[in-house]
Each structure stands twice: as C-alpha cells, then as structure tokens.
Design a protein with these regions (language model features):
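Binuclear metal-ion centers of metallo-dependent hydrolases, dominated by the metallo-beta-lactamase
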Residues: 1-3, 73-88, 139, 162, ...
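Core dinuclear metal-dependent hydrolase active-site scaffold
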Residues: 1-29, 79-142, 156, 204-208
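Short, Asp-centered acidic motifs that coordinate Mg2+ and/or phosphate
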Residues: 17-18, 33, 145, 172
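Active-site metal-binding motif and surrounding structural segment of the metallo-beta-lactamase
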Residues: 23-68, 142-147
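Short, acidic/turn-prone active-site loops that include or flank metal/cofactor-
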Residues: 24-25, 39-41, 64-66, 83-87, ...
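Active-site regions of enzymes building and remodeling cell-envelope glycoconjugates
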Residues: 31-38, 74-82, 94, 144, ...
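Redox-cofactor binding/interface segments in oxidoreductases and associated redox assembly factors
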Residues: 35-36, 96-100, 148, 175
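Metallo-beta-lactamase
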Residues: 118-184
C-alpha cells in the first residue's frame, strides 16, 4: 500500500501512484500525483521530483512551490496550489489541507500557510502531518492512519507526538521524520512506549 524510504518521503501504489514529500529517489517517472507539504529541502527536492515526473504528473502544494514547479517543466494546468483549512477536489480525489506550523519555534511559521493532508486512499483515511507541532486545532482530525513527525527540534518531539496521537485516536500511527536530520531510534522507542495500547504503532522505515 505505502512505503516511506526516508524522512517524510511517502509513496502510495494503489490504482494510481501518489507521492508525498518525495526525496532521495532514483529515476522512475511513475508519479501520477506529487503532494508537497512545504518547500524545505528535506520535503521538496527538485532532483527527485524530476526523477518521478512524467508528462501527466500533477503536483500539489502551498503557493511557495509554484514558480519552482514551472521551472521543472510542469504546465500551469498540472500545478495546484492549496491552503490550510480548505477542502479540494482533484480528478476523482477529495482531500483536506490542515495547518502545519510551529507554536514556539521559528522554522515553520503559521503565516507561511504550510500544510498537512487528510485524504482517503484506497478506502483508508490518512493524515499526513507535514512538519508541525502538536496543534490543538488538529486533535479532532478523523483518520484511520496518522503519519506524525517525532524527531523534535523542527517538529513535535516523541513525547508531544504521543500525547497528540492519544487524543486523536487513529487506528494506526506511523511515526516518521527522524533519523535523517534529527531524531533517533530512541525517539521511536519512547513514542511507541507512550502511545495507547488501542493504537497500533507501525514502523515507517528500518531502524536508524
């Protein structure tokens, strides 16, 4: 259904191939859709996007990506800019963008209008959080699978993420965004130990 190669780089292979924040992937040109949460280098990597892009690929993200997407050869009708707290229809998909920002850190400011995504993929509702702190306004997101950053420094840390997830109550949580820039296997272990037993903790990638 999905795999995460590193950081927050997700690939869904269902009836279409959907990427979120792809980085460090070799040439394959198989993307139907590429969703971007924000333009930082570990989420929006030009080389990888060019490796995934084909003539039919559509790219979706905050307004910051628009000019770069044009430079990469996307036509205007294959670029979709989105905002938090809005719901969108794209082809046969419906998705909501939710806020992703830091409360007391300068790395991801609220006014940047960067985002996470809530989307049904192959009958399962996913929340892909992006780089964010544990926001009160996101605690009531309804999803079956939550993909949550736990690395700290630039996002919520393992303890904050566990508290957030326990309030959200998805069926499954996939902690990610650790092991590349910040965060270690110890953060995964701490997170897993603090998540309610009713929620399944699924590894994003191999031990870091």
């Amino acid at each position: 259904m999905f795999d995460i190669n590193i950081q927050s780089s997700i690939r869904f292979d269902v009836d279409k191939v959907i990427y979120f924040d792809p980085i460090k992937l070799d040439e394959r040109h198989d993307a139907d859709y590429i969703f971007i949460t924000h333009p930082h280098y570990d989420h929006f990597e030009k080389e990888t996007i060019l490796n995934l892009k084909n003539d039919y690929t559509k790219i979706i993200g905050p307004k910051d990506i628009y000019e770069v997407a044009l430079e990469m050869g996307f036509s205007e009708d294959r670029i979709m800019t989105v905002m938090p707290n809005e719901t969108y229809d794209l082809d046969d998909m419906n998705f909501k963008c939710v806020p992703a920002y830091n409360i007391d850190k300068p790395y991801h400011l609220k006014e940047y209008n960067w985002i996470g995504y809530v989307m049904e993929i192959a009958g399962i509702i996913y929340y892909i959080a992006g780089d964010t702190d544990a926001l009160l306004e996101n605690e009531d997101i309804i999803c079956e699978v939550a993909m949550i950053p736990i690395g700290g420094t630039y996002t919520m840390n393992a303890r904050e993420a566990a508290t957030f997830v326990n309030k959200m109550k998805p069926k499954v949580v996939v902690p990610y965004h650790y092991g590349m820039v910040v965060g270690t296997e110890d953060d995964f272990k701490l997170f897993a130990s603090l998540v309610d037993s009713s929620i399944t903790v699924q590894r994003a990638y191999e031990k870091k």
